[in-house]
Amino acid sequence: MNYISFPTAQHAVDKIAQEFVIYSQLNHPVHISLSGGSTPKLLFKTLAKSPYAEQINWKNLHFWWGDDRMVPPSDPESNYGEVQKLLFDHIQIPAENIHRIRGENEPHFELKRFEEELSAVIPNGVFDWIILGMGIDGHTASLFPHQTNFDDENLAVIAKHPESGQIRISKTAKLIEQAKRITYLVTGESKADILKEIQTTPAENLPYPAAKIKAKNGVTEWYLDKAAVRLL
């Protein structure tokens, strides 16, 4: 496991925010896929403030999501809604740079629409940077243990949360693995046990999508805080 340990979650988030500045200064569109969860909320709040809000050339950055729940943006469960509230409402970014999963739509209709948008905007399917989280069950995006098809050739998939039954749309494992760079942002003591397991056990012997999904031709890295690395 290629990991970097930071003293706190805020330190990890600041490093990511600094890299947003660098990506935004490239002279071409940069496609970044965001994650839901508590640590990304800290990232969005950080990006919305000085100095990052002013230093980032937002018009060069295109934002996507690894997954989202099939709820409207006004619902607190919406990953897109969180980013809108914490970041997009506070910056100047072109509307066409935001490529959300439309959770208010019927799932099968939205799956087709979202795949068509992906194909049109990123024809080669290669994201510049995909930021992912990991649940304590080892899921990432909405790809859950024992129900993920790692050979699915589609770009996105309808997924069901194994406990709540909540419907989501997620990028497929194969699409994620085409990225130039994948960063797992994982913080907190609750993740320490599973991180130890991932570090010490071959991925093929584990059921966790987060252990298996890696960039095929790019960089895969883990940004962890002190609490998460305590057993490594």
From Swiss-Prot:
* Any matching Pfam family: Glucosamine_iso
**InterPro entries referenced in this protein's UniProt entry, alphabetically:** 6-phosphogluconolactonase_DevB, Glc/Gal-6P_isomerase, NagB/RpiA_transferase-like, PGLS
Has UniProt tagged this entry with the keyword tRNA processing? no
Q: What's a single GO MF annotation on this record?
A: 6-phosphogluconolactonase activity
Q: Detail the disulphide connectivity of this chain as listed in its UniProt entry.
A: none
Q: Which domain of life is it from?
A: Bacteria
GO BP, sorted A to Z: carbohydrate metabolic process; pentose-phosphate shunt
Q: Enumerate the UniProt keywords alphabetically.
A: Hydrolase
Catalyzed reaction equations: 6-phospho-D-glucono-1,5-lactone + H2O = 6-phospho-D-gluconate + H(+)
Q: What class of enzyme is it?
A: hydrolase
The biological pathway it contributes to is: Carbohydrate degradation; pentose phosphate pathway; D-ribulose 5-phosphate from D-glucose 6-phosphate (oxidative stage): step 2/3
EC number(s) from the headed UniProt entry: 3.1.1.31
Chloroplast: present as a keyword of the record?
no
Q: Which SUPFAM superfamilies match?
A: NagB/RpiA/CoA transferase-like
> Function of this protein?
Hydrolysis of 6-phosphogluconolactone to 6-phosphogluconate.
Which family, according to the similarity comment? Belongs to the glucosamine/galactosamine-6-phosphate isomerase family. 6-phosphogluconolactonase subfamily.
The protein's name is 6-phosphogluconolactonase
Gene designation: pgl
